Amino acid sequence: LYKESCGNCPILESHRTNDLSKKVIARKSKSYAKVPSLTVVGVSKWMAVCAGESSLFSNRKIVNIPNCLDVNLFKPIDKNIVRDLFNIPRNKKVILFGAANPTTDQRKGGKELFESIKLLDLKSVVLVIAGSTRPEKVEDFKYPVYFISPLRDEVSLPMMYNIADVIIVPSLEENLSNSIIESLACGIPVVSFDIGGNSDMIEHKKNGYLSQNISSKDLAKGISWVLEYDNYKKLSSYSREKVLKEFDSKVVAKRYIELYKDVLDGQ
């Protein structure tokens, strides 16, 4: 609906043509018309395309500049040290899944992940669920499950990522996932569905695995591929390299400076 003029907004559960969404988009259209040099930034290629399809921005300049990351904060840390801190076994391969309300928010793909875990045929594996306290009822997995309560500080987050051998981000809706960028910056390959801006960060079978279908079976295939890959160090190194090249705060800041210059030169 945003491609035309809104109304009957599904987010508002509205069935009226002249609802709040229609009034808001009309007001925005009137306001934006007063700024002829308005430039739109989509933080993912997918979002930039969506912006170009909208009635508000179809005739505007649209660029893609991603969110940035402090690569000095999110970086590889010795796994043995951080696993000891979180009481995770040193001698196991760790699958990490984390999100706010990861076991109850359907959009986070918990159902798809748990189904995929049951399909795995791997040895010496544990599952770590971050961002959630242990629920009263725990899924019956063939692998041990550890829970890490929500972490909010910038010191413990990178440490948590570094306990993992692979991080799963099975969200069914994403723009440009902070979790994916942060994981890759720590040198941890990521498995996710090929939706939203995920392909901006994950290069299939170079620093992770992109499942082309919303499929638990393919997600399981991706997890197995990462954990059994014969050159894991290469995956890990390229994960970090990708972030340094495209998402480092210095790199992104330079792109914004160039954009501001272009906008000012065009006025």
Where are these regions (language model features)?
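A short, well-ordered alpha-helix in the C-terminal region of glycosyltransferases
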Residues: 231-246, 255-258
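Short hydrophobic beta-strand element within catalytic cores of glycosyltransferases
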Residues: 189-192, 202
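Short alpha-helical segment that forms part of, or immediately flanks, the ligand-binding pocket
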Residues: 158, 177, 181-185, 199-200, ...
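Nucleotide-activated donor-binding/catalytic signature segment of Leloir-type glycosyltransferases, i.e.
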Residues: 124, 131-159, 163
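Aromatic "clamp/platform" in nucleotide-sugar-dependent glycosyltransferases that forms part
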Residues: 172
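A short, active-site helix/loop in glycosyltransferases that binds the activated sugar's phosphate group
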Residues: 17-62, 69-73, 79
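Conserved acidic donor-binding segment of nucleotide-sugar-dependent glycosyltransferases
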Residues: 204-205, 209-216, 225-230
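Conserved donor-binding/catalytic core segment of Leloir-type glycosyltransferases
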Residues: 89-108, 114-117
